[in-house]
């Protein structure tokens, strides 16, 4: 099942190609039943160049509401929508009412970026649109950024390029901009400004998209992007857009250290500008909307700002996802929101009339990386401060963000702002015990996979690490297990955790094959366990009364080209401690790995064994199939 997430449908381009025609059919029905126009943007933002995606926007150029997201998700995953005959009644209606639709100027607006698969996906969506009626109105905007399509859709009488040109004109603050070899390169190359220098502008080479560059690369790798040495300007301000130019981050180097000015810093700079420049003769509410991942040092800094008479600041923590921030921001006279990744915007009510210069530097609908870039440079020069002074606004508290595997993410229920767990309550109680004084932590479930994300933040790095380790272990051992009883003994089966790695676990593996425990590097093994993913899972069985790990098994998921990219589960390295044999733990482990393999969508599960173990695996419902061949090196 393909999910419609905060970024729309996004996955490998081959999957998007399969559902593209369905999307066209679904969008026509939305136009007809909602009596509104819609936009369709084909992009995968910061993802690898082989990925692609589709996201929908409403008639105002804003992100669509949840009911439309759920409709799209349900529609593309229902097999019946492949059958054109299902749409015959709708075709007749359209034949009768097509002129009314045109009279109301309803249509679909399609845009796509520079990814190699984008034009084909667009063609298939159009094919789906025209299946309902070959006269249905639509427009295609090739090679546009995501913010550009939002703009032309909601401001069709105005030129986006002219809007950018006007915003760029007053900029005099120097900056080197990494364009991620994405569609933003094409737009940036249209303009000339002696103070802005561009790198990574090869938008006509799709395979270079986001490769060793982009805002996501800089933040996740904490490294300068490729081509950074083209301009040897030490300590100068630099910025990176992402693949579809809807987000930006800033950074500079000093004494060989990379200092990143992310979305927290961008929001703090904008609010500083408002505190110094904005006046009002009537009550005015500014809202700073952020997520739980926003560093508390930034929130504290913003709360310390003083505003002019009649102006009030409200700080509002919203659920993760830019659409959630946007929905909260529009409630204020001025709403400022930015995620740490640099995706954000400033929303102005029409009654704000003394900030025309600043208003023209922000997108009227969504976050725009290019406009946000210009706005930051404009504010720096207007406030007459440099980027080092900007960086000194606050010192972020140490933090750790990690991902934890769980059996069922749906068991985790959070508050609206995602900072508190309603369920499981014992986990929230444990978090509360761990986090005292200036430390905080929260756990939130993923929207798509069976994992939760654990965030811990506080003033001392060592204490943050300790709290993170304790909560992580608690989740692994209590929230991620399946209990069973044999011979009046209770056992639990769960994913392995890095804190399980010790000499006893090595000795357990030594009962399976020869292991030189003295040569094993404990930290290297823990790092290996920490890096496991959903396609490489190690499970352990723990005796609840002694907390000993007494069995282990591995499940590897292989993605194949045959059987329509089918998956195969491989069971490896089954071992039960010699003191605990006779409890059926080996069979329980084998059965559990088989069930997990099925859950992950595998069409079969296979394993290798010696002839002496064939009888055991036959009792586990496995059948002999072929012969194993090996080549050892």
Identify the role of each PLM range.
Residues 6, 10, 14-21, 26, ...:
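Phosphate-binding chemistry for phosphorylated carbohydrates and sugar-nucleotides
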Residues 381-484:
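Catalytic-core signal marking the mid-to-C-terminal active-site face
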Residues 485-522:
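Short amphipathic alpha-helix that is part of the acyltransferase structural core
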Residues 529-540, 570:
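A short helix-loop-beta-strand connector motif used in the catalytic cores of GNAT acetyltransferases and
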Residues 540, 548-557, 575:
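Conserved beta-strand in the GNAT
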Residues 576, 582-595:
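Conserved acetyl-CoA-binding loop-helix of GNAT-fold acetyltransferases
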Residues 597-609:
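Conserved GNAT acetyl-CoA-binding A-motif
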Residues 606-615, 630-633:
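Conserved beta-strand-loop-alpha-helix junction that forms the acyl-donor binding cleft
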């Amino acid at each position: 099942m393909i999910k419609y997430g905060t970024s729309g449908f996004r996955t490998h381009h081959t999957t998007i190609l399969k559902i593209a025609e369905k999307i066209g059919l679904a969008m026509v029905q939305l136009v007809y039943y909602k009596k509104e126009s819609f936009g369709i943007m084909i992009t995968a933002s910061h993802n690898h160049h082989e990925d692609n995606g589709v996201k929908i926007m409403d008639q105002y150029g804003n992100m669509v509401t949840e009911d439309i997201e759920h409709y799209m998700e349900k529609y593309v995953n229902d097999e019946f929508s492949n059958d054109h005959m299902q749409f015959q009644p709708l075709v007749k209606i359209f034949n009768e009412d097509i002129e009314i639709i045109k009279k109301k100027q309803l249509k679909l607006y399609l845009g796509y970026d520079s990814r190699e698969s984008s034009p084909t996906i667009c063609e298939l969506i159009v094919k789906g649109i025209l299946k309902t009626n070959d006269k249905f109105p639509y427009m295609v905007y090739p090679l546009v950024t995501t913010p550009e399509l939002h703009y032309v859709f909601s401001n069709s009488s105005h030129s986006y390029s002219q809007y950018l040109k006007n915003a760029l004109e007053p900029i005099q603050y120097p900056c080197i901009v990494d364009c991620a070899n994405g569609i933003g390169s094409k737009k940036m190359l249209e303009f000339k400004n002696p103070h802005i220098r561009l790198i990574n502008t090869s938008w006509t080479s799709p395979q270079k998209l986001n490769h060793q560059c982009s805002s996501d690369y800089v933040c996740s790798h904490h490294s300068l992007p490729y081509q950074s040495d083209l301009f040897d300007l030490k300590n100068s301000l630099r910025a990176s857009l992402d693949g579809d130019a809807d987000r930006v981050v800033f950074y500079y180097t000093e004494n060989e250290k990379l200092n990143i000015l992310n979305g927290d810093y961008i929001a703090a700079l904008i609010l500083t500008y408002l505190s110094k420049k904005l006046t009002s003769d009537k009550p005015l509410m500014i809202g700073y909307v952020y997520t739980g991942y926003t560093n508390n040092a930034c929130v504290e800094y913003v709360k310390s700002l003083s505003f002019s008479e009649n102006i009030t600041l409200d700080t509002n923590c919203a659920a993760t996802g830019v659409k959630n921030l946007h929905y909260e921001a529009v409630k204020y006279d001025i709403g400022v929101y930015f995620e740490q990744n640099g995706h954000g915007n400033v929303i102005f009510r029409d009654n704000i009339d003394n900030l025309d210069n600043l208003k023209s530097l922000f997108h009227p609908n969504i976050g725009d990386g290019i406009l946000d870039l210009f706005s930051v440079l404009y504010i720096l020069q207007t406030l007459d401060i440099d980027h080092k002074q900007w960086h000194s606004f606050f010192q972020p508290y140490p933090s750790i963000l990690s991902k934890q595997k769980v059996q069922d993410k749906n068991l985790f229920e959070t508050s609206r702002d995602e900072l508190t767990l309603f369920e499981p309550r014992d986990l929230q109680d444990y978090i509360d015990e761990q986090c005292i004084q200036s430390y905080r932590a929260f756990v939130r479930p993923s929207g798509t996979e069976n994992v939760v994300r654990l965030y811990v933040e506080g003033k001392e790095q060592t204490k943050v690490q300790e709290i993170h380790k304790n909560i992580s272990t608690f989740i692994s051992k209590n929230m991620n297990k399946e209990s069973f009883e044999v011979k009046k003994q209770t056992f639990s089966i769960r994913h392995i955790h890095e804190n399980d790695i010790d000499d006893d676990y090595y000795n357990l593996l030594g009962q399976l094959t020869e292991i030189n425990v003295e040569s094993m590097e404990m930290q290297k093994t823990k790092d290996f366990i920490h890096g496991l993913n959903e396609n490489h899972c190690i499970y352990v069985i723990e005796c609840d009364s002694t907390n000993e790990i007494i069995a282990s098994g591995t499940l590897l998921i292989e993605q194949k080209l045959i059987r329509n990219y089918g998956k195969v589960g491989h069971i490896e390295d089954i071992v039960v401690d010699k003191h605990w044999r006779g409890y059926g733990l080996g069979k329980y482990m084998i059965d559990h790995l088989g069930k997990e393999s099925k859950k992950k969508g595998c069409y079969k599960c296979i394993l290798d064994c010696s002839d002496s173990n064939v009888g055991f695996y036959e009792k586990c419902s496995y059948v002999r199939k072929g012969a194993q061949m090996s080549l050892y090196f």
